[in-house]
């Protein structure tokens, strides 16, 4: 947790391409239960109902959710502190790549709420065994650390997770309701 706070503070002091006013607009939009469109920079009404596909583009720091092939909503995300390479072993701080399923909802997460991603696959377990390493696990889509929700959209200024995909708590509230267990998730670089 101390590392998370230090990274956020450093990134805020160092400056970034998004202004304080823009973060305020994003947080106000999300707090009103609406969706921030990162492409247009506008607040929009969000579609109701469940989604059937999640796509995470690691290089763009963007998570998109779909229903019936139609884009429903996009989220700016923070990723693993270990860089853009695919997850290879436990503790590397990287986000895995591949196609998975959401396997469970966790209402008691240390990060507001979370959705467990079905990593590792049998193939990833076998590949890790051949390398003589543990593939790791506990990969989630989650909110901000408990009692740190005030950070809001600013959390995306730095990759701070241990290999998970992080969104704001308000965004996580929406995802938690809209994403059923079994939903396919594709993670690419």
Where are the regions a protein language model picked out?
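Sec-dependent signal peptide recognition
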Residues: 2-9
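C-terminal motif of bacterial Sec signal peptides marking the signal peptidase cleavage site
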Residues: 14-15
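Bacterial lipoprotein signal-peptidase II cleavage site
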Residues: 18-24
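Disulfide-braced loops of extracellular cysteine-rich modules
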Residues: 25-30
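Extracellular, cysteine-rich, disulfide-stabilized repeat modules with beta-strand cores
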Residues: 34-38
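N-terminal post-signal-peptidase region of extra-cytosolic proteins
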Residues: 44-53, 58-59, 79-103, 122-127, ...
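Exported/periplasmic cell-wall-interacting domains
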Residues: 50, 96, 104-189
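Short Gly/aromatic-enriched secondary-structure transition segments
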Residues: 70-82
